[in-house]
């Protein structure tokens, strides 16, 4: 199952983490990977998840170093044994650090898992794979 929370409204990450907490409470294992965020968010200290931490000091304009981290994160995700995989802000690395084809391949690799994805951008071909899509909008 693939769930997507997208848009420019607040609450995408909170919703994804809430889903992860419910899954953890039901005995599932959860992996969290946060893209384009540093690893200083306060919730990371208390979440009972497997967390693939982003670089501590994310540069304003990430480049080759960040690309290497993204590549290692994708490998970690593909090899994860977790039941639930949260890809926070993943939509925003598609077409910059991950090609659309590679992102679709990733979803195919995870077809036996529940995947929760957040980000700002709407990507039609990617969204076609989703079971649930929630558009969060500032009003």
Residue spans of the language-model regions?
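Conserved P-loop
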Residues: 2-79
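Conserved RecA-like P-loop NTPase ATPase core
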Residues: 13, 86, 130
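Fold-independent oxyanion-binding glycine-rich loops
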Residues: 7-8, 35, 88-90, 118-120
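Hydrophobic "anchor" residues on beta-strands that sit immediately upstream
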Residues: 84-85, 114
């Amino acid at each position: 199952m693939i769930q997507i929370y997208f848009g420019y409204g607040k609450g995408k990450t909170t919703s994804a983490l809430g889903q992860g907490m419910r899954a953890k409470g039901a005995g599932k294992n959860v992996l969290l990977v946060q893209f384009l965020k540093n690893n200083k968010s306060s919730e990371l200290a208390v979440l009972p998840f497997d967390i693939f931490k982003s670089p501590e000091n994310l540069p304003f304009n990430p480049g080759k170093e960040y690309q290497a981290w993204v590549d290692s994160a994708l490998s970690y995700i593909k090899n994860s044994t977790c039941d639930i995989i949260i890809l926070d802000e993943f939509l925003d690395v598609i077409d910059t650090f991950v090609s659309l084809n590679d992102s679709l391949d990733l979803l195919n690799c995870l077809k036996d898992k529940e995947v929760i994805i957040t980000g700002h951008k709407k990507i039609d071909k990617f969204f076609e794979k989703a079971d649930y899509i929630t558009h969060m909008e500032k009003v």
